[in-house]
Amino acid sequence: MDTELLKTFLEVSRTRHFGRAAEALYLTQSAVSFRIRQLENQLGVNLFTRHRNNIRLTTAGEKLLPYAETLMNTWQAARKEVAHTSRHNEFSIGASASLWECMLNAWLGRLYQLQEPQSGLQFEARIAQRQSLVKQLHERQLDLLITTEAPKMDEFSSQLLGHFTLALYCSSPARKKSELNYLRLEWGPDFQQHETGLIAADKVPVLTTSSAELARQQLSALNGCSWLPVNWANEKGGLHTVADSATLSRPLYAIWLQNSDRYSLICDLLKTDVLDEQ
């Protein structure tokens, strides 16, 4: 049996709502419904009764619940044990390309400088979309996630690392938004809410990317503008803020599993300020 089906079943039974379960699992609601149907087809029974927003476990669902919890706990324990024996002194940190380029690269350098030579700690820097990294964190395939969005799942712990400032930049001075093409740099799903109020609704991006460096290099060629971290843009030089634009403050969070066996190490690493250069 696919453990993802059981995990979805447990989340729906916990929230009693397909939409909230989908949000917690970072899936679409249709994907959650499909997984539940798959599980019901495999078992040959209905697991939930569905009446509008009133979702309840059937008798069969109630009977499955303790077994599903036991199976998932056993599976997680097995994954943890196998991962522990294979990883030794490896520690994995995940973030988007832009965060690595603009601030985490410098932080990683400081971590290496502060490590005791005999510690033998090896870092793995992973670059991926937030949704993929959250899944890896949940499945114990990732130790620490750095992101601009607070966690939505109860089993995650987090620490607010601070804030950094974004500004709208272009490659030449005294330019207005209406004169420039828009290059969308992905700063997280919730950033789109702010973006809507700061960029004209009919402004279709000529480029969408998760790399700040790529966006910066394309500003001149595409006659474009993009939201970039102020300190990083100042370090790079040759960039100018768009005349009729504002600045925007963004939070930065460290996220890990509540019961992570790397908790002590995480606390030690986070003593080194991630935003020290920001």
UniProtKB/Swiss-Prot annotation:
Coiled coil spans: none
A GO biological process held by the record: negative regulation of DNA-templated transcription
Keyword terms, alphabetized: DNA-binding, Repressor, Transcription, Transcription regulation
Disulfide bonds: none
Source organism, top-level taxon: Bacteria
Annotated region of DNA binding: 18-37
InterPro entries per UniProt: LTTR, LysR_subst-bd, Tscrpt_reg_HTH_HdfR, Tscrpt_reg_HTH_LysR, WH-like_DNA-bd_sf, WH_DNA-bd_sf
SUPFAM superfamilies: Periplasmic binding protein-like II, Winged helix' DNA-binding domain
GO terms for MF: DNA binding; DNA-binding transcription factor activity
A Pfam family the protein falls into: LysR_substrate
Domain HTH lysR-type: 1-58
PANTHER family for the chain: HTH-TYPE TRANSCRIPTIONAL REGULATOR HDFR, TRANSCRIPTIONAL REGULATOR
Function: Negatively regulates the transcription of the flagellar master operon flhDC by binding to the upstream region of the operon.
Family: Belongs to the LysR transcriptional regulatory family.
Protein name: HTH-type transcriptional regulator HdfR
Gene name per UniProt: hdfR
